[in-house]
Structure formats: C-alpha cells, structure tokens
Amino acid sequence: MSFLVLPPEVNSALMFAGAGSGPTLAAAAAWDGLAAELGQAANSFSSATAALADTAWQGPAATAMAAAAAPYASWLSTAATRALSAAAQAKAAAAVYEAARAATVDPLLVAANRHQLVSLVLSNLFGQNAPAIAATEAAYEQLWAADVAAMVSYHSGASAVAAQLAPWAQAVRALPNPTAPALASGPAALAIPALGIGNTGIGNIFSIGNIGDYNLGNGNTGNANLGSGNTGQANLGSGNTGFFNFGSGNTANTNFGSGNLGNLNLGSGNDGNGNFGLGNIGDGNRGSGNVGSFNFGTANAGSFNVGSANHGSPNVGFANLGNNNLGIANLGNNNLGIANLGNNNIGIGLTGDNMIGIGALNSGIGNLGFGNSGNNNIGLFNSGNNNIGFFNSGDSNFGFFNSGDTNTGFGNAGFTNTGFGNAGSGNFGFGNAGNNNFGFGNSGFENMGVGNSGAYNTGSFNSGTLNTGDLNSGDFNTGWANSGDINTGGFHSGDLNTGFGSPVDQPVMNSGFGNIGTGNSGFNNSGDANSGFQNTNTGAFFIGHSGLLNSGGGQHVGISNSGTGFNTGLFNTGFNNTGIGNSATNAAFTTTSGVANSGDNSSGGFNAGNDQSGFFDG
C-alpha cells in the first residue's frame, strides 16, 4: 500500500526500523573502490597496448589490433567514470534518507499520542474530556501529515537521485561485440507497460480516465487515490473531494465514513470536525443529530451537553431548556431535578427560583401528562411548548427527544424534519446535517440519496453538485465516479465527455444525447445545467434539475417534481418541499417535509394546515 495512505504508526515504524543509511554508504565506498580499480585497469591497458604497438606489433595487422583494442580501453575509462558517479549518487541517496528520517515523527511520540487518547476516552464518563480528545486527535492529524510530508520528500529526493544514474547499457552498446545490442536492450524489454487507458499521469494501473499519478481506480483527479471519482489525494473510497478520506462522498480531509463535510469525522453526514456519529453540525460531538460542539448524546442544541434533546449549554440529562441543568425537562438555569420552571431549583415540578421540594405534576400550564415544564404539551417531560410526545425541548413537535421545532420523529435538533437524528432542517430521513435532504447521512443540502456532502444530487456519495448518479466529485454529471464536469457515463476526469474514462475536455455544449441548451448531461433534457433524464428547466434559475422527469423552476432533485423550485424527492409541487407528494407553497421561504402535506412549514403526513407536525392536521 502507498505510504500516502498509511498512518504514522506504520510510516514512522518502517522508517525507524529499517537498516538505515549504513548499507548505502557501504555501497558508495564499494563503488569508489571499483572506480579506482577500473581507472587503474584502463591506464594499464592503454599503456600496454601503446607499448606493443611501438615494439612487437608491426604492419597492417598491428594497426588492426590497435584499432580493436582502443574501444576496450575507452570502455574501461567510461566504466570508471560511471562507477564514480554511482558512488556519488549512493552518497546522495544516503543524505536524502537521513533528511527524511530526521523529518519523520519518532514512533514513541506517536505511541504517546495514542496512549493519551485511550486514557482520555476511558475517563470521559461525562464528556468532560471532549476538548482534550479533539485536541489529541488534531495533534495526531498533524503527526500523520508530518510523516506523509517526510515520505513525499523522501520519494521525490530518491527519484531525483535515481534519475541522475546513467544506464550501463550505453557503455555495453559501445563494445565491438554482436551480442552487446541484445544485452543493452534487456532493461527495455523488462519495462512494465502502462496497464490502463485514457490516463494522464504515471503509475495508474488497471484504470481509466485518471488525471494524476498512482491512482488505483477510475476517473480520479489527483494522486494516489484507491477508488474512483475522487478529487484530491490519497482517498480510499470514491466520490471524495479532499485528502485521505476513508469512505465515499466526503468533502475535506481525513474522514472515516461517508458524506461528511469537514475533517476527522468518524461516521456519516456530519458537518464539522472531529465528530463521531451521524448528522452532527459542529465539532467534537459524540452521537447523532447534535447542533453545537462537544455534545455527548442525541439532538442536543448547544455545547458540552451530556444526554439528549438538551437546548442550551452545558446540561446533563434530557430535554432541558436552559443552561447548567442536571436532570430532565428543566426550563431555566442551574436546576437539579425534574420539570422545574425557573432557576437554581432542587426538586421536581417547582415553579420559581431558588426552591427545594416537590411541586405540581406539571410546572407549565395547559399540559396533559407528567413532568412538563413547558405549556400545552401532551406527554411526558417536555420543556418546550405544544408538543405531543416526551422529552422535547423544542416547540410543536410530534415525537420525542426533539430540541428543534415542528419535527415529526425523534432526536431532531433542526426544524421541520420528518425522521430522526437530523441536525439540519427540512429533511425527510435520518442523520442529515444538511438541509432539505431526502435520505440519510447527507451533510450537503437538497440531495436525494445517501452520504452526499455536495448539493442538488440525485444519487449517493457525491461530493460534487447537481449530479445524477453516484460517487461523483465533479459537477453536473450523469453517471458514476466522475471527477470532471458535465459528463455522461463514468470515470471521466475531463469535462463534457460521453462514454467512459476520458481525461480530455471536449469542445461541445452538452454531453449525452438529445439535450437542448447548454451545460446539460444525460438524455433528452431541455434548458440549462440539467443532469439526468428528460428534465425541463423553464424557471429563472440558471441551475437546472437533477434526476428524472422534473419540470418547472430550477433545482428540483429527484423524480417528477414540478413547481417553482427547490423540491426534493418524488412528485412534489409548489416550493421548497422535501418528501413525497407535498404541495406547500412556503411563500415565506419556510420548508415542508413529509408525505402529502399542503401546509407551509409543516412535517409529517397529510397536513393541510401551516406549522403542523404529525399527521392529518387541518
């Protein structure tokens, strides 16, 4: 495997465990000795030949013998020079190695970082070590980058040294021997052919359509990618934009998962850095659907919360609305207990400040249930208002553990979602950190599919924009694993290609067949900037549709959407709907998600009224 994708534990260990520069310096000394011997032999041979020509060799035969001996003397002199050059290059190679070893991170430092991480994680019972864990991971990324930089420098220096070596075949070819040309051609006969087609670069093996070097896959733009359709370096997966992503559809660097927008995320659909889980917005979150940083749990809106559906910072528990609460459904600050309405209380159901004891079943008004500190709730332990369910700190939710508003489902920190674990808003699905997505694990916006960090895609694992298909890091493509733009087919790193595996930019207006307009890919589209099949862009937006059979204003995503624009999913009309068969107009630029809703700013299903969650509300 390439050093570009190896962690510092491996690169550092390999560099420090090797034989060092000793054998190379010994080889340099041997080459110096050989050069001296060859030089002495050349001088002796020339002297002997000259002496014979002056004494024993006479006549035409002597002239012929001297002419035959001269090339051997010349070859010995050339060989001595070549040996001296090889010695110099061996010394240079040793110097390059020593410089690379000095720049490589000591394995003990890497081990100390990993030991520190394990210690912090094991003692992180209440999330108090989250900042230190994030800092340790950031330091580890720097160690990784330092090792890769050292190895890249080593590779470059060693390649430069090797390029200076003169081939011995030229010297062999000068010998007056009929077998010399055959011997000289030996290395050329052993050269490995380029095992790929349509690549621009070197070392792309069994692959097509790459721009760059050492890619094992197709349609990449960049170097050392193991996968297809990547834009960047050393990605292990497909459709990534960035460096060393392990997964697909990521935008940025060193993500382990899919559809992440940011760095060092472990999971999918995260927007931020150092998250572990699904659909988080922010940094250092452990869990799903959190908005903020260093939360441990689900659907927290704030930072340093431990638990779920907390709205504020830093709370420990569930559905607290405020700051520094320890317990459940407290509305206020610095409370210890359950369903307290106020500040600095210790107890259950207290209304007021600085109280100790047990109050009413519900501290809010108009509630049906128990432990509600908000108003007009039906259920248990709601600190928000107008909720049906339990543990909601937001308003107008149908479900549980929602810290956002007007959600149908559970664990949503965003607004008007139908599903669960969404930190974004207007989603139909789960684990989305972006907005208006149909599917799961999307950190981008208005996608229909899985693991997209880009926008307006119909498909999965796209880090580009407005693609119909999968694993594209480019834009406006119909197909698979394209790192170029406006292509129809697969594995293109160039632009406007139809077919498979081209690194070339074509001088045409559209790719595909039957398209009318400019910037289209796919089949039978009309208008501008569409991807997919039989889409018609008649709106004022320059950007068109992705998917199949969409019509009307621009930027519909999915199948058979119509209306003024920005619908994602299936059979939606109107404006800014996500889901199936919604017809809301959302005149105030709100969002509707779910199934067959006609009301604005609603989630769920079959709601005709505005600002509704759940099902069948008028």
Swiss-Prot record:
Gene3D superfamilies: PPE superfamily
Domain of life: Bacteria
Region (Disordered): 598-618
SUPFAM superfamilies assigned to the protein according to its UniProt record, in alphabetical order: PE/PPE dimer-like
Biological-process GO terms, alphabetical: response to host immune response
Signal peptide location: 1-29
Record keywords, A-Z: Signal
Residues forming coiled coils: none
InterPro entries: Mycobac_pentapep (IPR002989), PPE_dom (IPR000030), PPE_sf (IPR038332)
UniProt keyword Mitochondrion present: no
Signal found in the keyword field: yes
Family of the protein in this entry: Belongs to the mycobacterial PPE family.
Name of this protein: Uncharacterized PPE family protein PPE16
Species per Swiss-Prot/TrEMBL record: Mycobacterium tuberculosis (strain ATCC 25618 / H37Rv)
Name of encoding gene: PPE16
